[in-house]
Protein backbone atom coordinates (compact mmCIF):
# COMPACT_ATOMS: atom_id res chain seq x y z
CA UNK A 1 0.00 0.00 0.00
CA UNK A 2 1.42 3.35 -1.03
CA UNK A 3 1.72 6.14 1.53
CA UNK A 4 -1.20 8.49 0.95
CA UNK A 5 -0.41 10.61 4.02
CA UNK A 6 3.16 11.67 4.70
CA UNK A 7 5.00 13.73 7.31
CA UNK A 8 4.60 17.44 6.57
CA UNK A 9 1.21 17.11 4.83
CA UNK A 10 -1.57 19.56 5.65
CA UNK A 11 -4.58 17.49 6.73
CA UNK A 12 -8.21 18.07 7.72
CA UNK A 13 -9.71 16.18 10.67
CA UNK A 14 -12.89 14.36 9.58
CA UNK A 15 -14.15 12.88 12.87
CA UNK A 16 -13.78 13.24 16.62
CA UNK A 17 -13.74 16.20 18.98
CA UNK A 18 -11.36 18.15 16.70
CA UNK A 19 -13.52 17.66 13.58
CA UNK A 20 -12.99 20.41 11.00
CA UNK A 21 -9.59 21.50 12.29
CA UNK A 22 -6.55 21.50 10.04
CA UNK A 23 -2.94 20.83 10.95
CA UNK A 24 0.38 19.48 9.79
CA UNK A 25 1.33 15.83 10.17
CA UNK A 26 4.34 15.61 12.51
CA UNK A 27 4.63 11.82 12.71
CA UNK A 28 3.30 8.82 10.77
CA UNK A 29 2.91 5.40 12.42
CA UNK A 30 2.36 3.10 9.40
CA UNK A 31 2.29 -0.19 11.34
CA UNK A 32 -0.56 1.13 13.51
CA UNK A 33 -2.32 3.10 10.71
CA UNK A 34 -2.13 6.27 12.81
CA UNK A 35 -0.79 9.82 12.44
CA UNK A 36 0.13 12.60 14.87
CA UNK A 37 -1.11 16.07 13.85
CA UNK A 38 0.25 19.28 15.39
CA UNK A 39 -2.24 21.01 17.71
CA UNK A 40 -4.92 18.33 17.30
CA UNK A 41 -6.07 15.63 19.75
CA UNK A 42 -4.13 17.21 22.63
CA UNK A 43 -4.21 15.10 25.79
CA UNK A 44 -2.83 15.58 29.29
CA UNK A 45 -0.23 13.11 30.52
CA UNK A 46 0.72 12.81 34.18
CA UNK A 47 4.46 12.19 34.38
CA UNK A 48 6.50 11.12 37.35
CA UNK A 49 9.55 13.21 38.25
CA UNK A 50 12.94 11.77 37.33
CA UNK A 51 16.46 12.89 38.20
CA UNK A 52 16.68 14.98 35.04
CA UNK A 53 13.06 16.04 34.41
CA UNK A 54 10.42 17.60 36.59
CA UNK A 55 7.13 15.75 37.05
CA UNK A 56 3.66 17.14 36.49
CA UNK A 57 0.91 17.36 33.93
CA UNK A 58 2.16 17.67 30.35
CA UNK A 59 0.00 18.35 27.30
CA UNK A 60 0.96 16.48 24.14
CA UNK A 61 -0.58 15.41 20.85
CA UNK A 62 -1.96 11.87 20.72
CA UNK A 63 -2.19 9.88 17.49
CA UNK A 64 -5.32 9.74 15.32
CA UNK A 65 -6.38 6.88 13.05
CA UNK A 66 -5.71 7.62 9.37
CA UNK A 67 -9.38 7.02 8.51
CA UNK A 68 -10.24 10.14 10.52
CA UNK A 69 -7.97 12.48 8.55
CA UNK A 70 -7.84 13.54 4.90
CA UNK A 71 -5.20 15.45 2.98
CA UNK A 72 -6.12 19.11 2.39
CA UNK A 73 -6.40 20.09 -1.27
CA UNK A 74 -3.51 22.48 -2.12
CA UNK A 75 -5.90 24.60 -4.23
CA UNK A 76 -8.98 24.90 -1.99
CA UNK A 77 -7.81 23.74 1.44
CA UNK A 78 -10.73 21.31 1.70
CA UNK A 79 -10.47 17.57 2.40
CA UNK A 80 -9.75 15.43 -0.65
CA UNK A 81 -8.91 11.88 -1.56
CA UNK A 82 -5.44 11.08 -2.88
CA UNK A 83 -4.61 9.44 -6.18
CA UNK A 84 -1.34 8.62 -7.93
CA UNK A 85 -0.02 9.59 -11.34
CA UNK A 86 3.35 9.40 -13.09
CA UNK A 87 4.90 12.71 -14.07
CA UNK A 88 8.30 12.81 -15.81
CA UNK A 89 8.84 9.16 -14.87
CA UNK A 90 8.15 9.83 -11.17
CA UNK A 91 5.15 8.69 -9.17
CA UNK A 92 3.41 11.71 -7.59
CA UNK A 93 0.39 12.13 -5.34
CA UNK A 94 -2.55 14.01 -6.83
CA UNK A 95 -5.64 15.56 -5.19
CA UNK A 96 -8.70 13.79 -6.63
CA UNK A 97 -10.98 16.85 -6.31
CA UNK A 98 -8.83 19.37 -8.23
CA UNK A 99 -6.18 17.28 -9.97
CA UNK A 100 -3.49 19.39 -8.29
CA UNK A 101 -0.15 17.70 -7.51
CA UNK A 102 0.40 17.33 -3.74
CA UNK A 103 4.11 16.40 -3.81
CA UNK A 104 6.29 19.45 -4.34
Curated annotation (Swiss-Prot):
Function per UniProt: One of two assembly initiator proteins, it binds directly to the 5'-end of the 23S rRNA, where it nucleates assembly of the 50S subunit. One of the proteins that surrounds the polypeptide exit tunnel on the outside of the subunit.
PROSITE patterns with a match to the protein in the record: RIBOSOMAL_L24 (PS01108)
InterPro entries: KOW, Rib_uL2_dom2, Ribosomal_uL24, Ribosomal_uL24_CS, Ribosomal_uL24_KOW, Translation_prot_SH3-like_sf
GO biological process: translation
Cellular component GO terms, alphabetical: ribonucleoprotein complex; ribosome
Full protein name: Large ribosomal subunit protein uL24
NCBIfam families cross-referenced by the UniProt entry: rplX_bact
Family assignment from sequence similarity: Belongs to the universal ribosomal protein uL24 family.
UniProt keyword Nucleotide-binding present: no
Quaternary state and interactors: Part of the 50S ribosomal subunit.
Record lineage: Bacteria, Pseudomonadati, Pseudomonadota, Alphaproteobacteria, Maricaulales
Keywords, comma-separated and alphabetical: Ribonucleoprotein, Ribosomal protein, RNA-binding, rRNA-binding
Top-level taxon: Bacteria
Cytoplasm among keywords: no
UniProt xrefs under CDD domains: KOW_RPL26 (cd06089)
A GO term, aspect molecular function: rRNA binding
